Amino acid sequence: MMGLRLKILSWWTPTWVISRELDHVFQVTTAALKSLLAAHALEIQTKRSDEKSKPKTIEQKRASMAAEHAMLVEALATSIGPEEALRLGREALFRVGKQLGMANRGKLGVGSNPMDLIRAATILYRVLGIEFNIERSDKKRATLIVHRCALSQHYSEVTCRVLSATDEGVVKGLNPHVNMAFTEVLTSGCSKCRAQIEFEN
């Protein structure tokens, strides 16, 4: 039954599921960044929106989340320097991503085979407005190529590299025997994002 859920949602994901999962990703990623800022005695004043001004559509929610990410990462970089912000931000967001991956592995019934990982990634990237494909090199290596990212227009390169650690953590959470690391990102001027994937067995 769980494997069937994974297959169905990878083919078609209802809007309400995308909206719910997007809200959750928004919550946990911004909470991690705010916690980092608080640890460095920084308090960021965020705008409190009333019900009328809250983002309602999927596109609005993605844009709002990305703008919040950018503001928080830039504030951290201004305070402690971009290199330290990158290091600490990636560590924190990798942990968040791994937890998200583990939770979705259970909910979706993700097995150990590569196809299950690709199906789960399809669902999660659909939530974020990211279009991608996978190119296999051999049994142990593959490349993830992102053609479109709804978040990239709101991100600086530093923000993008911090938040990409979430994706890397998600993959590790979905399958503990798989590692992913981004080598190219759209925000650095590349035409596509690329991440190297390695299968341990």
Outline where the language-model segments fall.
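An acidic-aromatic pocket/loop used at catalytic or ligand-binding sites
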Residues: 195
